[in-house]
């Protein structure tokens, strides 16, 4: 198996919680540590699993009515750091940045909000910033990180975990990265179409 990587820490930031329970149960069984924010963190804890708050890592609260939660160097550094790069690893130690091996995201439902006839203000609030940034960061660093970019992929990761435990190979991670850029491309195309109408 080429370039196998162990999943030790998962950042979970999702809008839709349905279908997440079984995946979290398997990750917990494999000893994976959870990191999350807001509603997702409460959901994880409601299932009986320990979950570290993103705010505890960043030492910065969620601000601007929840518009800024995960956008912080300690989170993005943990995703983007190259595990085989000595300079990156030294900086992670220096700035106490934790490695994040798995990112699970489910974006704000922009298209559904538009289709519901919501106001422009409500539609704008459903333009995901942190989530799309997490998707791009995880996909860019697929050499080291697994990115699950939507609830449609929960089952795909669950199947891998059932077969291999909390390990993935480079082919798995590249497949998720391809799907991630597909999700981000579709999402931004929908936003562009709304602005262009």
Model-derived segments and spans:
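Conserved residues at beta->alpha junctions
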Residues: 14, 83, 148
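Structural motif
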Residues: 2, 27, 92-95, 137
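Short acidic, glycine/serine/threonine-rich loops at helix termini
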Residues: 22-24, 45-49, 56, 63-66, ...
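Short glycine/serine/threonine-rich phosphate/pyrophosphate-binding segments
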Residues: 19-20, 87, 132-134
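Glycine-rich nucleotide/cofactor/substrate-binding loop typically near the N-terminus or early
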Residues: 39-109
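N-terminal glycine-/serine-/threonine-rich phosphate-binding loop
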Residues: 1-57
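Short, basic, glycine/proline-bearing loop/turn elements
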Residues: 6-13, 73-80, 120
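Internal alpha/beta core interface subdomains
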Residues: 5-8, 97-197
């Amino acid at each position: 198996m080429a370039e196998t990587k162990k999943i030790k820490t998962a950042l979970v930031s999702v809008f839709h919680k349905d279908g997440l329970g079984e995946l979290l149960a398997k990750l917990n069984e494999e000893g994976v540590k959870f990191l999350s924010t807001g509603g997702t963190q409460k959901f994880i804890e409601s299932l009986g699993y320990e979950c570290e708050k993103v705010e505890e890592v960043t030492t910065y609260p969620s601000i601007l009515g929840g518009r800024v939660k995960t956008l912080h160097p300690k989170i993005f550094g943990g995703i983007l750091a190259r595990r085989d790069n000595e300079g990156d690893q030294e900086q992670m130690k220096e700035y106490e940045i934790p490695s994040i091996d798995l990112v699970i995201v489910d974006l704000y439902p922009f298209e559904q909000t538009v289709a519901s006839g919501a106001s422009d203000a409500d539609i704008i609030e459903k333009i995901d910033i942190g989530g799309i940034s997490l998707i791009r960061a995880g996909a860019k660093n697929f050499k080291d990180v697994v990115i699950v970019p939507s609830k449609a992929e929960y089952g795909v990761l669950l199947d891998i975990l059932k077969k291999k435990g909390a390990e993935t190979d480079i082919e798995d991670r590249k497949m998720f990265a391809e799907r991630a850029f597909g999700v981000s491309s579709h999402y931004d195309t929908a936003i562009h179409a709304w602005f262009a109408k």
